[in-house]
Amino acid sequence: MSESDLRAAIRREMPGVRADLERLVRIPGVAFEGFDHSHVERSAVAVAELLRGCGLDTEIVRHGGQPAVIGRKAAPAGAPTVLLYAHHDVQPAGDPALWTSDPFEPVERDGRLYGRGAADDKAGVMAHVAALRAFGDQLPVGVVVFVEGEEEYGSDSLDTIIHEHLEELRSDVIVIADSGNWDIGRPALTTSLRGLVNMFAEVRVLKSAVHSGMFGGPVPDALITLARLLATLHDDDGEVAVPGLVGREGASVDYPADRFRHEAGILDGVDLIGRGTITDRIWTKPSISVLGVDAPRTLEAANALQPTAKAKISVRLAPGEDPKSAYDAVRAHLEKNVPWGAQLEVTLESDGQPCVIDATGPVYDAARAAFRSAWDGTEPVDMGVGGSIPFIATFQELFPAAAILVTGVEDPYSGAHGPDESLHLGEFERVCVAEALLLKNVAETMTR
């Protein structure tokens, strides 16, 4: 099919693609513990039906975790096979009061579709479906569509699924549609992602809670103890202060501080922390954040000193760093700096490898050409991402000859993982066009 034919086909398919995306968004498929996992099952069934509708041999697979979907269509003679990855599970919606509308009832406002998963990553699923629908029975490559069901919860069973279905997943090109673009109107290839270590730190100072008036003063309550300990993780500039955590500088993309402040929603008067350029700080240097604290709610807090306090700490690792070494470094720092002789327990929740992709060669040239065409001549950016997709390292290890392309539908205003997550509908159509053109270009580049 010609480029103009593919563009026209995508345009024809978009109403149906959007309707199917909205149906997916209405399924609250959260893989976290404590949520109704029957919705994740429903989501997997819906995705499987979409892939079967594209003519793929499709199965739902699971190995101890939430269901994934694998759809396959054999390559024409001499043509390459492309693996198309996305995930159908979503983050919890959080407090509904923070959303302008129901998080699981998609609503369009000002050219954006709002709803949990509208961008991350059900639109990634539908970008794959849109490209396949555009080709119909003229698909020039083989495809394996792999849609995971627990990415947001750490992909615990993903390695097992990959190893159990290794030959089915083996491909020449891997497209991971779980990232985003540099800006509205500016496409991007993601070429580096930080690694991740999530851990817990719990301090204990008392056998049980005691009266804050009778004992307050000489007794170090657990919340203040924990607060002082967490404060040692950064210096006065907000730079990570843990020996052994290293990064590098020199990210090449200019990211003005005022744009970053706007996109992050930083309040007036609040300083940025750390040192170096914005891109260094979010792409190539480590960061440490406190994601939550176990403590009494203020409305329920009694006049009592708390015996224990616990924090969840998230460490993002610079590309090239080892998660185990990073965990050991942070644990050693906490153990060295725990105040007032408090008892401390540090435990690992999860970790994931960072990755760097050498985005050179004919497949990457084909991808950039597809992006350039879909965005009417705009040159794509090679960018880093501060977040993590740990299984990319697994793909790199198991399929070393495959070219890995990290793409996606998000833009700086998508608000993934937060309230009012949204998808720019105009950019979504460009993403669908780009993926169809990518498959066309890969076929022309690699068919023997």
Predicted regions and their residues:
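Acidic, glycine-rich active-site loops and adjacent beta-strand->loop/helix elements
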Residues: 88-90, 146-154, 177-182, 205-207, ...
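Zn-dependent metallopeptidase/amidohydrolase metal-coordination segment
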Residues: 202, 226, 293, 305-309, ...
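N-terminal helical capping/dimerization or prosegment-like subdomains
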Residues: 2-96, 308-312, 325
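Acidic-enriched catalytic cores of C-N bond-cleaving enzymes acting on peptides and small amides
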Residues: 212-293, 321-343
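Active-site metal-coordination/substrate-binding segment of hydrolases
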Residues: 79-147, 430
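Short, low-order "capping/linker" segments at domain edges
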Residues: 355-373
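Acidic/histidine-rich catalytic neighborhood of metal-dependent amide-processing enzymes
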Residues: 117-192, 447-448
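A short beta-alpha structural unit
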Residues: 316-318, 345-360, 384-386
